Amino acid sequence: MTDEPTNRINMEKGRQVYAQTRARLASHPASGKTTIRAVAKLLEDMHIEGRVGKFRLESDEPAVRGGTELGPTPLQYFIAGAAFCLLTQMARFAPLYDVPLEEVQADVRAEFDISDKFGMAGPDGAFEHVTYAVTVRSSARPEQVRLLVEHAERACHAAQSLRQPVPVQVEVHLNGQPLPLIHKGPLNQHL
């Protein structure tokens, strides 16, 4: 963090966008429903190219796990997304709490065990623990910052999706035909 005391948020713009969004949602409640989409394609080994809107992303694994290290791992993108989401919500709601944000940083860490996918006894591969360490520099009172962070955390779809079970559906097409998946038994029972 630097010593330069500059509010990184356009407070007036933030208040205007908030008011406009509330007005739109009040008059058209269905406009609050949103779908986001990412499309990914395996290039070679663990190297994957993804597209999210107009943006191109690359993902890979470390050499020790069969990759060529041409990009962050999928889970690194996942936790970076969680950090981006929380900071976006803090920036979005800072004007409502009169919290100038001179500097904000989120350090997100996720702990998990890979044993299960390699046929070893262990947890199911889900994150065991996720920690958001948020560092804020602001001239606002501590109570204002606390309220802002609590609001941002509740408004962060990534944090809420990590907290609550979310139904996941996987659809597979093999050579143009649907291929039903049957989830039975241990992960590696067929290897």
Which residue stretches match the model-derived regions?
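Extended beta-strand/beta-hairpin segments
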Residues: 1-79, 92-191
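Alpha-helical metal-binding/catalytic segments enriched in His/Glu/Asp
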Residues: 82-86
